[in-house]
């Protein structure tokens, strides 16, 4: 498939004098003067924008399929997310028993090792539990929380630590330093979240090797003028990528704008943190074995606690421009390149030879037109 006459986002700019060839799920060639191969389909994009596929580093579920359900659900998530323009994602776990966690990590490994065509790539697990603070549990179940230890991590993963790409943890817990250092040594990205840490403890965790903050502002100590908490460190420490849920529900618009001004187009990471109702109508659903009610784009436990989102990555991208005042160039990076960089995923989040499909197509004013590839 040869793509012509579009505005392709390459190297942080939109380029119009470019042709891009897609084949077998990847970009296979790029040049200004590419001629079609014999029998090759040629698509005239008529000036539409073409962006890299999205990378979602924090997503629990989609359209009724939940990571914690296992392999079949994760594969179906991958197929359906591809159609929404997602090139890669991290199936994200909830706090659960050791046996259930081990089962899900094994399922994620099987999907990683046997990817399907026309399905988003699973790049590993985002373990959002169990090394969390009971004070900031959010929708995670406290009865499964543990203090961090490498031995517990080996048990939870069945020894397959490389199936885990990111682990969220509270850095103020006992033995956190030893765990963070060991995880970083083994190429696992430590994300600070569900934590009652102080500003100083977050900076210290970055010194130990933490590189990310999980859904900044949510389920963590708040920012105040004398105790800036987790957000204070997240927004000022250049070593840290900062996830955020830009759905207009989890965060006040100005809180997102502050994050974007502080982290810029280099370190802000859009996520969905979506649960199984994403892409489905309002109603009664579940997250981590807990009942969730979805009404008007809000997913809440029965006690009113927010329980993930119903956000799509393409909506997160559009919100960055329409709601939070970002340029198209910045919005693209925050939804593609930055998430990929924050988890060390080469070959994703950019348009280049070897990059994975799908690409996404957008019309005037960035109206969604679907996927390419």
What are these regions (language model features)?
Residues 133-161:
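Conserved phosphate-binding/catalytic loop of the ribokinase/pfkB sugar-kinase fold
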Residues 60, 75-104, 120-133, 160-172, ...:
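Divalent metal-dependent hydrolysis catalytic cores, especially in the metallo-beta-lactamase
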Residues 47, 58, 81, 127, ...:
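Conserved, mostly hydrophobic/aromatic
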Residues 1-37, 371-372:
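N-terminal metal-binding scaffold of metallo-dependent hydrolase/deaminase domains
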Residues 266-288, 293-310, 353-354:
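Short acidic/histidine-rich active-site segments
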């Amino acid at each position: 498939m040869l793509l012509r006459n579009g505005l392709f986002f390459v190297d942080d700019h939109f380029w119009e004098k470019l042709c891009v060839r897609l084949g077998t799920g990847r970009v296979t060639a790029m040049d200004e003067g590419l001629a079609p191969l014999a029998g090759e389909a040629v698509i005239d994009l008529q000036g539409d924008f073409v962006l890299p596929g999205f990378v979602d580093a924090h997503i629990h579920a989609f359209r009724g399929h939940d990571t914690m359900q296992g392999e079949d659900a994760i594969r179906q998530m991958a197929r359906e997310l591809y159609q929404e323009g997602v090139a890669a994602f991290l199936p994200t776990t909830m706090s659960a028993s050791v046996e259930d966690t081990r089962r899900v990590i094994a399922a994620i490994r099987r999907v990683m090792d046997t990817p399907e065509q026309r399905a988003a790539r699973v790049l590993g697990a985002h373990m959002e539990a169990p090394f969390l603070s009971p004070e900031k549990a959010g929708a995670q179940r406290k009865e499964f929380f543990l203090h961090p230890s490498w031995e517990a991590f080996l048990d939870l993963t069945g020894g397959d630590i490389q199936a885990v790409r990111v682990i969220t943890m509270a850095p103020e817990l006992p033995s956190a330093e030893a765990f963070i250092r060991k995880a970083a040594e083994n190429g696992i990205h430590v994300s600070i979240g569900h934590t009652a840490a102080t500003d100083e403890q977050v900076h210290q965790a970055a010194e130990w090797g933490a590189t990310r903050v999980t859904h900044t502002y949510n389920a963590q100590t708040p920012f105040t003028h004398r105790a800036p908490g987790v957000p204070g460190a997240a927004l000022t420490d250049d070593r840290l990528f900062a996830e955020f849920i830009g759905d207009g529900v989890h965060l006040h618009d100005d809180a997102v704008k502050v994050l974007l001004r502080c982290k810029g187009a280099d370190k802000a990471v859009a996520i969905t943190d979506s649960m199984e109702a994403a892409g489905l109508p309002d109603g009664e659903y579940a997250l981590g074995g807990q009942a969730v009610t979805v009404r008007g784009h809000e997913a809440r436990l029965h006690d009113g606690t927010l329980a993930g989102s119903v956000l799509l990555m393409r909506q997160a991208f559009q919100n960055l421009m329409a709601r939070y005042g970002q340029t198209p160039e910045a919005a693209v990076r925050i939804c593609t390149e930055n998430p990929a960089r924050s988890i060390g995923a080469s070959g994703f989040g950019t348009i280049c030879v070897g990059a994975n499909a799908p690409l996404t197509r957008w019309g005037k004013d960035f109206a969604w037109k679907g996927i390419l590839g």
